[in-house]
Structures are given as structure tokens and as C-alpha cells.
Amino acid sequence: ITHDLAVVAQMADRIKVLLKGDEVETSDTASMLSAPQEDYTKSLWAVRSFRTEPKALPQQEKPLLELRNSCASYGQHPVLHDVSLSLYRGQTLAVIGESGSGKSSTARLITGLLPPTYGEVLYDGQPLPADFRQRSKEQLRRIQMIYQIPDTALNPRQRIVDIIGRPLTFYLGLKGKAMRARVAELLEMIELDPAIYMERQPRELSGGQKQRICIARALAADPQLIICDEVTSALDQLVAEGVLKLLNRIQQQLGVAYLFITHDVATVRAIADEVLVMQRGRVVDHGSRQQIFTPPHQDYTGLLFSSEPQMDPDWLDRLLASRTPQTSNPSLEKV
């Protein structure tokens, strides 16, 4: 049972497609992949073609966010080694790597949850305190985060108006009618009807709708930078595409910058302007989307890309046959 179509292509003999509890169609894998009969199935198969257009950003003298030679540890265990990155206003920087590569630790360092043992974090050219508890309310407001699992990020007992309204009150001082009016605007921005959703609780929403609420809550603080930590990994591919399109539209409207933490190559290919590749806590590759995806690849980057499952039943067999003992990497078995 999965929403990952590429995994289905490798593992299944037959495929059953469901929509809202009803069977859409059932067939053997080869037939389903090559010639789906129903429109819904065809739409599922087509989602991996989404791409944003490269942005022509204005020349900027300094990055919005900069990490300089940052190192960090959990106790005696080092997790980041000499990590540097730059992110500009209105730009999307994707940080990609396998599990344990340091992606989420980088996000924790930026947000002040993981103090660096060396190096510094600069925001708009000014050093940020290493510990979030030492940061001003204004510094906290400017950097917001959208988490991987909305069910753990949203208070199940609160109404949507309270969830989105809290940062409006905390950061901007909005209360009462002014707060509710702004919540309604934010719901419209994420394409949810305020009249329907404002008084609901998270348990009454679908997974995609919950993630949109998380987006609205982040936007409520009026941030300049949003860190997106695996924001589509818990969603089926059709819903995930809708979330990526929404984030792209919001960026075009507001000029917000995104730091995308992901292990999904398709997401990077779809939305990134710049790409940072991490392995074992180090940056091993960096460049524009075009540069990173144009061969020849750096060795580890090439291994990551070749490990991206394809909607082809023979893909895994071909991949395993192509990997010799000299070029295989056991650490990528989970990718």
C-alpha cells in the first residue's frame, strides 16, 4: 500500500488504483504503466513532469541567509563539517542527500535549535545568535518552518482559525476581527474556502489540506525565508504536485525565499533554483539546477540521481546490473 508510483513499478505484479474509497481500475503492472485507461490514473502518471521556470532574480549584493564554515555536533557525535551556503531573496535552494547526510541538522542549526560548534549563521548580513532563545522576536519572525508531518505539527484540539491566528497575534499583534480577517486572507491564499475551513479542526482535513494549513501558519508571520523540511514526502504525488505549485505561486507573489530539505530528486528537479548536495555532514556538490542535473556529475551526485526510482518495471534490474563492486555504495541502499 503506497502512494509512491515508482516503487509500485518495481515491486507489484498487479496494480489497483483507488480514489475516495472506490476502485478506479485494476490491471497488470506493465499494462497499467504503459496504457492507463482512466483519467485519474493518467493524471497520477503525469505528475512527475512538473517543473518551475528558472528565475531571473535581480542582482543582490548580499545573501538573505548565509552559513559560513559551520560545524555542529549532537553531544560527542559530529553531524556537520564545514558547511557553507548562501540563499538570496526570492530564491529556492534545495538541500538534498540520503538519510543521515545532515540536511535536517542544517535546518536545525539555521533555526537555532542546534548551536554550531564552529562557524556562524548570518541573516541579511548580520550574525544570528546561535540559540533561538537568544534571538529577538523579529529575528524569529523572519525565518519560519514547514514540517514533514502535519499531523505532528498541528494541535489536534485547536480550530484552524486559532492555529493560523496564533502567529498573527504573537508576531504582529493582531486580535479579534483583524486577526480573523487576516486568517481568511491566508486561507484564500492557500486555496481553501474560509467559510468552510476556518472553524474546523485538523482531524477534519485531508493530509494535503493539513499541509496547506501549515503553509498558511508559516505565512502568517510574514517571513522572508521559509524552511520546507520534506514537506511533500507524506503526500501522494498528485497532492504533492499541488503543494509545490502552490509554494511556487506564493513565491512569485510575495518574493519569499525557500530552503527545501529533501531526499526526493524529482522535487529538486521540479522547484530548485540552486542545489546543495550533502553526504555525511559535508557539502559535496553545489550549483544551479541546470549545472547539477547536466552530466558529467560529481560521483556521489551521480549515484543519488541514478538511485531515483523510475516508473519502469525493469529499472531496478538494470541499475543493479550496471553497478560494479568498485562503483557501488552501500550507504545508498536506502535511497
Give the predicted meaning of each segment:
Residues 8-10, 268-270:
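A short, surface-exposed alpha-helical micro-motif characterized by mixed small hydrophobic
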Residues 23-27, 35, 283-287, 295:
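ABC ATPase "signature
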Residues 111:
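Helix-to-loop junction immediately C-terminal to a conserved catalytic motif
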Residues 119-130, 139:
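Conserved ABC transporter NBD signature motif
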Residues 201-205, 209:
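Conserved ABC ATPase signature
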Residues 222:
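Conserved catalytic motifs of ABC-family nucleotide-binding domains
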